Amino acid sequence: MGNCGRKVLRALSFLLLLGSSSAQGTWEAMLPARLAEKSRAEEVAATGSRQPHADRCPPPPRTLPPGACQATRCQADSECPRHRRCCYNGCAYACLEAVPPPPVLDWLVQPKPRWLGGNGWLLDGPEEVLQAETCSTTEDGAEPLLCPSGYECHILQPGDEAQGIPNHGQCVKQRRQAEGRVLRQRLHKEYPEGDSKNVAEPGKGQQRHFP
């Protein structure tokens, strides 16, 4: 029994030693592959921030431009001059002229929702701004800086009347619902009360015609 037990222990020890060496060999065989995979991941992470920005690239051409495949290739925007981006030219990535970013819409006046009946609401779009047109409603002895017809002065800085600083703003297009009121005010200025020329207002009795 003693000899039999020693043989069994030797056999178990041999099997354990064999399994240990086999596992070590397997790990050593897998180690280069793992290191290579880690190296590729680090390379991708390092170059990820230098990838071309597609939002600044022109759309790819439908037909291949001449010399597109012979152009100097790039892999990142940092390889291109200041006003160029690494973009696809139909054949390869090359330094192309950057596309300007889309314009930003400035909401000068917050639109007010209009009730359409029931649960329906209509939200107006932004007011149209007259390009580079400033205005003021302060009357300091001279004519105020008014807006053209169909526009109203949206005050951006109130100014200070005590110090003689007039307010100023930008001309924005008047809302549709205010057009009738503006027209009546304009006609009232042109034909004040007591003048023979007047116009009829809705619901204000009979209409008086111009002579």
Curated annotation (Swiss-Prot):
GO BP of this protein: negative regulation of inflammatory response; negative regulation of wound healing
Task: Give the UniProt keywords, A-Z.
Answer: Disulfide bond, Protease inhibitor, Secreted, Serine protease inhibitor, Signal
State the signal peptide span.
Answer: 1-23
Which sequence ranges are marked TM in the entry?
A: none
Asked if the Swiss-Prot or TrEMBL record annotates the protein with the keyword rRNA processing, the reply is: no
Q: Which residues form the WAP domain?
A: 50-99
Q: Quote the subcellular location field of this record.
A: Secreted
InterPro entries given for it?
Answer: Elafin-like_sf, WAP_dom, WFDC1
Q: What would be an example GO MF term here? A: serine-type endopeptidase inhibitor activity
- Principal localization reads secreted
Q: Where is the composition biased (Basic and acidic residues)?
A: 182-198
**Where are the annotated segments for Disordered?**
182-211
Q: Give all cystine bridges in this chain.
A: C57-C87, C69-C91, C74-C86, C80-C95
The answer to keyword Disulfide bond applying to this record is yes
What are the record's GO terms for cellular component? extracellular region
Q: What does this protein do?
A: Has growth inhibitory activity.
> What protein am I looking at?
WAP four-disulfide core domain protein 1
**Lineage, broadest ranks:** Eukaryota, Metazoa, Chordata, Craniata, Vertebrata
This protein's encoding gene:
Wfdc1
